[in-house]
Each structure stands twice: as C-alpha cells, then as structure tokens.
C-alpha cells in the first residue's frame, strides 16, 4: 500500500484505466480507496496467475514512466479485468476471458485438441509477446481460409450450359452430332454453341393449329358467299318491283 503513495494522480489514474477499474476523479478523499482497489487487484492477480509467470504478470512501477504513453495503445481484455474486479470474494471459480476462449481456474482442463488453444493472457511475459501470438494466430487462420478457397471447384459459363443441355437436350443437335445423352466436360463448350444455333431451327410454333388470318374465312361462315350474293340480288329485285308499282299507282289514280 505504501508503494502507491509515491504515485501522482495521473499515474494512479493510468493504473485504474489499465486494470479497467471504475473510477472517478482522483482527489484526496478518494485516493485511499483507489489505492486499496489496485492493491487488492494485483494481490488477487498474483495469486491466480501460474507460478511460472507470477513475476511477469505483476505490474512493475519502475517502468511506469516508459509505458505511460503506450497505456492507451493496447489494453488487456476488458472482460477479463471487469470479471476479476467484479467477482465477489475472489474465489477460485473465477472466469478469465482472453481473445480466443474462456478458462476456469480451479477446474481441470479437458483433454483434446482444444488444450493448445486455451491459453491464459498472463502466461505471456509481456504484452508484446501476447500481441505477437495473436498476430501469428490470425496469419494461420487466414492461410487456412485461402487453402479452403483454392480447394473449392470453380464453375464457369460452360457449367451453366451443361446443366441446361442436360435437362433439356435438343433432339436435332444430338442426332446430327451423334453425342450421348449426358454430355462430358470436354464436349460441353462445343455442344453449347451447336445447340444454341440448331435449337432455333428445330423450334416449332407454340400453337400449330392456329392458321393465318383469312385462310378459312369462307368455311367458318354458315352461308356461302354465292348464296349471300344471290339473296342480295333477290332483295334488290323485290325492292325494284315495289318501287315500280308505287310509281304506277301514283300516275293512274283511277
């Protein structure tokens, strides 16, 4: 606790931000409380950290001036620090979250391939080694994705023609080229060009029963054309006789 008394208000605020401890302005009345929180945090962190990295995980006050400018550049996982500070009693069932997985202290690790992935943030000697490990894992994941993309088959325009000719083969093009019903990959491009040209030649009308307009005009009517002309002449003659008799009656009143 006496080590924190030599720190200035700015240095104490930097420690609070580094450990992700909620705090307000550092004044005379709240300074003692913040020093106690930092002391409890570092004590519990040294107790929970592995023995091999207990010295490296503790914060060295001699390097405070050198790391003051880099305090805002990188931070330890905030979830880890928040859970560490908010855990009541600081019991062994404490969850520490890194960028990759969640680890429970006080419980045995499950055997399997996930053991290599589960790593504590405090196992690294410093933050540079941690970020170097994160960078290596990112490069490994990106290289694996590139390998998966290379293994995926590439489908071009010929594959689309192959599916069309497979489900809708043209009979004329098949018989003329003497090809099998199921096309192969080597003859796909040749069949696509030949089928596209010959399919227009062998296409039939959608409604072949429909004829051109006026082709069967006389057959569709009930009365033939000569019968209609005959009826028209008879009607004209009848009108002519009616008109003639009407004129004769007007000329001879008796």
Curated annotation (Swiss-Prot):
It is a single-pass membrane protein. CDD domains: LEM_emerin. Found in four different phosphorylated forms, three of which appear to be associated with the cell cycle. The modification Phosphotyrosine is found at residue 161. Residues 168-186 are annotated as: Interaction with CTNNB1. The modification N-acetylmethionine is found at residue 1. Its main location: nucleus. The modification Phosphoserine is found at residues 8, 29, 49, 54, 60, 87, 98, 141-143, 171, 173, 175. Residues 1-45 form the LEM domain. The keyword Transmembrane applies. GO terms for molecular function: actin binding; beta-tubulin binding; cadherin binding. Gene3D superfamilies: 1.10.720.40. GO terms for biological process: amyloid fibril formation; cellular response to growth factor stimulus; muscle contraction; muscle organ development; negative regulation of canonical Wnt signaling pathway; negative regulation of fibroblast proliferation; nuclear membrane organization; positive regulation of protein export from nucleus. Skeletal muscle, heart, colon, testis, ovary and pancreas. It is linked to Emery-Dreifuss muscular dystrophy 1, X-linked: A form of Emery-Dreifuss muscular dystrophy, a degenerative myopathy characterized by weakness and atrophy of muscle without involvement of the nervous system, early contractures of the elbows, Achilles tendons and spine, and cardiomyopathy associated with cardiac conduction defects. Interacts with lamins A and C, BANF1, GMCL, BCLAF1 and YTHDC1/YT521. Interacts with TMEM43; the interaction retains emerin in the nuclear inner membrane. Interacts with SUN1 and SUN2. Interacts with ACTB, SPTAN1, F-actin, CTNNB1 and beta-tubulin. Interacts with TMEM201. Interacts with NEMP1. Stabilizes and promotes the formation of a nuclear actin cortical network. Stimulates actin polymerization in vitro by binding and stabilizing the pointed end of growing filaments. Inhibits beta-catenin activity by preventing its accumulation in the nucleus. Acts by influencing the nuclear accumulation of beta-catenin through a CRM1-dependent export pathway. Links centrosomes to the nuclear envelope via a microtubule association. Required for proper localization of non-farnesylated prelamin-A/C. Together with NEMP1, contributes to nuclear envelope stiffness in germ cells. This is Emerin. It comes from Homo sapiens.
